[in-house]
């Protein structure tokens, strides 16, 4: 009689073991990679002030950005990536007074040696209207260069549902 209950209990627990982990890799590297998301949102947020140079400090000189919200337009090299942030992206537009935030369940990072991936969704909150200005995703491929993590490739775009 105990055996069917044990099997049932085991079956009920299996989904918990099957769910993918949000992070994988050495803890110190995960922390460093996740700090990129913090720097990203600090740079694009109006409080204390928007900081394009801080945003660009995240990117390698040969970084490639793909804007999935605009027909997969590609920006190659750090100067073109800067152009994207100045001319296309919402956070750096002068009329937008946004604060960026990523809910904990919407960030994932994986580190293997000197390579990493980082995915997060951004809720850009408009401080003037107290409403969501944009809901976007960022998917990055990172490389450790001289001890620092830099963005090599990134895809950005809109998220349709919260």
Indicate where each model-derived feature is located.
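Short beta-strand edge/turn micro-motifs at domain boundaries
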Residues: 19-21, 135-162
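Sec-dependent signal peptide recognition
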Residues: 2-8
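Short, low-complexity N-terminal intrinsically disordered segments enriched in polar/charged residues
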Residues: 18-58
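Short, solvent-exposed secondary-structure junction/capping segments
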Residues: 38-45, 56-73, 90
């Amino acid at each position: 009689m105990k055996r069917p209950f044990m099997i049932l209990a085991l079956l009920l627990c299996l989904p918990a073991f099957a769910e993918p982990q949000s992070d994988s890799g050495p803890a110190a590297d995960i922390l460093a990679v996740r700090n990129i998301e913090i720097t990203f949102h600090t740079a694009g947020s109006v409080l204390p002030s928007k900081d394009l140079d801080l945003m660009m400090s995240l990117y390698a000189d040969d970084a490639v950005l793909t804007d999935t919200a605009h027909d997969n337009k590609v920006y190659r090299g750090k100067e073109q990536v800067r152009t994207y942030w100045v001319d296309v992206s919402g956070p750096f537009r002068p009329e937008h007074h946004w604060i960026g935030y990523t809910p904990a369940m919407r960030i994932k990072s994986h580190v293997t040696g000197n390579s990493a991936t980082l995915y997060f969704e951004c809720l850009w909150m408009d401080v003037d209207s107290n409403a969501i200005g944009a809901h976007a995703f960022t998917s990055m491929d990172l490389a450790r260069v001289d001890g620092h993590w830099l963005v090599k490739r990134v895809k950005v775009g809109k998220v349709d549902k919260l």
